[in-house]
Amino acid sequence: MTTSSHSSEQPTSTQTSGMWGGRFTEATDAFVAEFTASVQFDQRFYKQDIAGSIAHATMLAKVGVLTEAERDDIIQGLSAIKSEIEAGQFEWRIDLEDVHMNIESRLTQRIGITGKKLHTGRSRNDQVATDIRLYLRDEIDDILTILLRLQKGLLGLAAQNTQTIMPGFTHLQTAQPVTFGHHLMAWFEMFVRDTERLQDCRKRVNRMPLGSAALAGTTYPIDRAFTAELLGFEAVSENSLDAVSDRDFAIEFNAAASLIMMHLSRMSEELILWTSAQFKFVNIPDRFCTGSSIMPQKKNPDVPELIRGKSGRVFGDLISLLTLMKGQPLAYNKDNQEDKEPLFDAIDTVRGSLMAFADMVPALGPNIEIMREAALRGFSTATDLADYLVKKGVAFRDAHEIVGKAVALGVQEEKDLSELSLEQLQQFSDLITADVFDKALTLEASVNARDHIGGTSPKQVEAAIARAYDRLEKLYA
């Protein structure tokens, strides 16, 4: 096997158009070469591109297109190139346009004419489609691992707060008492759905387009099932036209990523409110916050604020891909070069945001007494008083009106329902007796009464947490 050093000289005109030089009478314009190049960002595919090429060469040798010696030279050369890249010794050249041609060119430099045989039976159209799928498959697996860490963090914090009572809100107004553990489990459910979506998306990512060539397939006797097995794909694509032009899987991932970011943004919004001086429900450790250059007292929840802001860019990445694809005829078009940066950005943003939350959530410190005091304000047990009357034979709509009048008195006297005297309550209904204070108007009575699957009672939250661990075990099996 021959090797040569990787030249840093600028390419000649012939080299500039080396991929398609036979058809053209002049070299590519320098600006056009730079404008159409993608190597600046698609070089992050290098591992997947090399893995795909090794599998392709192995398959070509199996069907007799390459000799075993040629296969071995190619594999050895590609492995050496991978080491060069990881050692920071590889020179990425814009004139070679993309990650594929940079690696192939370097391979030919290292092993000679055998390197030029690697692309037999393959096009960059099916090559890049394969690279993207391999890359996204790896990234989904990584994101799922981080999601699991966040989910376990939520479960751990919820288990510590099954008895911690806080106000539940609708319209950001006090509604009914809930446990903090129950609220945390609501967040958990959002991320379970995200897990399911990513796992479902991965099934469609894990289809191999390699072998589709430019658009119509290839005349060589390739064994696509063998290549798919080498690369860990579950199946091969069924239609070559669709395979090289399909980016549904990337759009689907960005949609799932957008939902993850939406959930993180909602969670961030609550944390931002809860850490404010007006709420004081939760403390975020200093290591996740920053200060002010002018106001010495400030402790800003920058991590949730930034994640709330970053959600918008991921939504934009989804729209970018949808807009990119909406006008393309079959099959591959150069437009698809623009699919990578929105995908990369969504991946990077979601991964980073999830990592931040996975680290931060277990460290959140609830201010239990402040939460409880807040639940005592805003007449959070009003519905319980109405239910108390219903159980004594009052129609719910009439009970609603009775309690509304009691609330009006409480507003007038600046007292919670539990702070009104029995005599004051009885002026609205003589069915109200002394047991109302224990059965309906305490926070504990309110949350304990909601003792059913999905309810906020400590008993049900504990059961939900136990079920959640079982669900995670099955989800990630």
Swiss-Prot record:
GO terms assigned for molecular function: argininosuccinate lyase activity
Cellular compartments per GO CC: cytosol
Ranges annotated as biased composition (Polar residues): 1-18
Disulfide bonds: none
Main location: cytoplasm
Record carries keyword Cytoplasm: yes
Pathway annotation from the record: Amino-acid biosynthesis; L-arginine biosynthesis; L-arginine from L-ornithine and carbamoyl phosphate: step 3/3
GO term, biological process aspect, one: L-arginine biosynthetic process
Catalytic activity reported: 2-(N(omega)-L-arginino)succinate = fumarate + L-arginine
Sorted UniProt keywords: Amino-acid biosynthesis, Arginine biosynthesis, Cytoplasm, Lyase
Domain of life: Bacteria
Keyword Transmembrane recorded: no
EC numbers, comma separated: 4.3.2.1
Alphabetical list of PROSITE patterns matching this protein: FUMARATE_LYASES
Region (Disordered): 1-21
Family to which this protein belongs: Belongs to the lyase 1 family. Argininosuccinate lyase subfamily.
NCBIfam families (UniProt xref): argH
Name used for this protein in its record: Argininosuccinate lyase
Organism: Acinetobacter baylyi (strain ATCC 33305 / BD413 / ADP1)
Primary gene name: argH
